[in-house]
Amino acid sequence: TSVLAEINKASFLSDTKKEKYEAEVRCARGLICYYLYDMFGPIVVATEEELDNPTQEKPLARLSKEEMVKYIETDLTYAAAHLPSPSEAEYGRFSKGLAKMLLIRLYLHETVSDKSYYDKVETLANDLMSSSMGYSLSDSYPKMFEVGGQGPDNKEIIWALPVNTEMVSWNDWHMFVLPTDFDDHGMPSGYESLNSTWYFYDSFEDGDTRRTYLVDSYKSKNGTIVNRENPGTHMELGPIPM
């Protein structure tokens, strides 16, 4: 909110630049507010005037559910109207596609209490899948999770988070999903914190490439094979989402 005020005050910015930056900020605010709303319910939203007086104590009430949804919807609708199209947006930056995807998530969230939101979901989803948006399914589902499978050429990705592969880093995901007794593929064991489900695994037919990175068996440190028939403590819940 404060950033939006500063953008409007910036006399050195053209109206076109102001519109672009406002759309990016409102998309970011819509994204963050949706996450907070999803986890905690309606939140407190301070006005620009209240933010300009941080030392003045003033109890603020949470927004109502309807006000919260409208607040997020307004930001994302503005962003969808003013952000560049996916083909014109710089890789990794916000685009119309992301704003519309977030609106779909918001509307799906609300279908629990109001089924009419499905109509909005359908309209936006059809728009997102239209040829004018430039998205398409990847020829290889597993490749999207492999080195080289991402990047601007992958038209299935709606919003990418670019990383510098030259920097020193490590794979946190494997540490969260690998079992504590994992001893396979030359990889270390992990924290055993996350699983997929057998229900999801069984939704794909045998030979479906979407099972490729759902590991349904592994060799433990004591040499036994852990799988659905011999689940131990980890595979009872489902396969490992590698």
Stretches with model-predicted labels:
Residues 4, 36, 44-46, 157-161:
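Structural recognition of the beta-strand scaffold that forms the well-ordered cores
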Residues 37-44, 87, 106-115:
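Short coil/turn linking the two alpha-helices of tandem helical-hairpin repeats
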Residues 1-40, 60-68, 76-89, 242:
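Conserved, well-structured interaction surfaces
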Residues 123, 127-130, 134-242:
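Elongated scaffold/linker segments in the mid-to-C-terminal portions of large proteins
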